[in-house]
Design a protein with these regions (language model features):
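Bacterial Sec-exported substrate-binding components of ABC uptake systems
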Residues: 5, 10, 17-53, 154-186, ...
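Short helix-initiation/N-cap motifs at beta->coil->alpha
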Residues: 33-35, 83-95, 221-230
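Extracytoplasmic/secreted envelope proteins and their assembly/folding machinery
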Residues: 41-44, 51-59, 94, 98, ...
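A short, structured surface patch at a secondary-structure boundary
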Residues: 46-100, 104-111, 214-217
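Alpha-helical, coiled-coil/dimerization segments enriched in small aliphatic residues
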Residues: 72-74, 195-225
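Proline-aspartate-enriched helix->loop->beta-strand connector
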Residues: 94-107, 126, 229-243
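Extracytoplasmic ligand-binding site segments that recognize negatively charged/polar headgroups
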Residues: 113-116, 132-145, 180-204, 250
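Structured C-terminal subdomain patch of bacterial secreted/periplasmic proteins
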Residues: 138-141, 145-148, 157, 161, ...
Length: 308
């Protein structure tokens, strides 16, 4: 369906040229995370944001949102908006989105469906910016672009640079502690097939843990990225096991509980000493955005005890 609509829009764009692009001086031109040049109008009044985490970031920058996805409302970022997807943004109603004529669309560069939507939106002459926010540095970069579009530089200072200083202090405090905590970070699904360890290369929490001075056993045991090898985990015997869930949260928790009840797993140091922790979803499954310092402080306390 998207492909058919895209072909029609490409024909239309050939006939209409680039008249819909913001003239020089009336918008901010930048390169998005798909490597494409975007010209976003300054202070747009009708904006669509297609994931809840990006909606949170746009609101933090001082923007307003008229069109979004159901998860944005479920997480309490907005009370009401026109929805083009009832869930998390994986099945966007592209025809309705285009019909609404937003001045700017902000979408995920990570979701294949949204990348296709972005292509169709560009063909329709609608400015669209695709972003990938995996680390605090990504957050700062995207926040800066958003505050430039919205002409709210003070938001970048209070919700960006001020947070950087807090995080730098937390990292310095953690690095000054004695010892190197050895951890296993797991993204848990409903069964062994969907439960795997993660590293700094493929999960932002592992980037944070590394910055705080922790040693992730999966970094030296890539077999854990394919599944939780009991033999490898026993050999490494981590000080702590941290996990988040994917998909059905209750099923992920139930699977981890059943795994940790196994006598072999319960014999691990982390199990014996009560250092198995499910990380809060709002900080470690979704991106924490303006709560990055809170997320770093939470991990620091798990690794070392109370923060300074």
């Amino acid at each position: 369906m998207i492909r058919k609509l895209l072909c029609a829009l490409l024909c239309l764009s050939f006939l209409t040229g680039c008249a819909s692009l913001a003239p020089a001086g009336e918008g901010l031109t930048f390169t998005d995370d798909l490597g494409l040049e975007v010209t976003a109008p300054y202070s747009p009044e009708k904006v669509a944001v297609l994931t809840s985490s990006l909606a949170d970031l746009w609101l933090t920058a001082g923007g307003s949102i008229q069109i979004t996805v159901g998860e944005t409302l479920e997480r309490g970022f907005l009370e009401d908006a026109l929805l083009v997807d009832a869930g998390a943004g994986k099945t966007v109603d592209l025809e309705r989105l285009i019909a609404e004529g937003p001045e700017l669309v902000v979408c995920s560069a990570e979701l294949a469906g949204q990348r296709e939507c972005a292509e169709a939106l560009r063909a329709a002459g609608i400015p669209v910016a695709a972003f990938s926010v995996e680390t605090f540095e990504d957050y700062l970069r995207v926040l800066k672009i958003c505050t430039q579009i919205l002409k709210t530089p003070e938001k970048y200072e209070t919700c960006g640079e001020a947070l950087r200083l807090e995080i730098e202090e937390l990292i310095a405090d953690a690095r000054a502690r004695e010892g190197t905590p050895r951890i296993l970070f797991v993204r848990a699904g409903s069964s062994a097939r969907y439960t795997k360890a993660k590293t700094a290369e493929n999960h932002f929490v592992c980037v944070m843990l590394a910055a705080l001075g922790a040693e992730n056993i999966a970094e030296k045991a890539p077999v854990l990225l394919e599944g939780l090898s009991t033999e490898e985990v026993l050999l490494s015997d981590p000080d702590a096991i941290l996990f988040t869930t994917m998909g059905d949260e209750a099923a992920g928790i139930a699977y981890m509980e059943s795994l940790l009840e196994d006598p072999v797993w319960s014999s691990l140091r982390a199990g014996r000493e009560g250092n198995v922790h499910q990380l809060p979803k709002d900080l470690f499954q979704y991106k924490p955005n303006s709560r990055w310092p809170e997320a770093y402080a939470y991990l620091t306390e798990l690794l070392y005890g109370e923060t300074a």
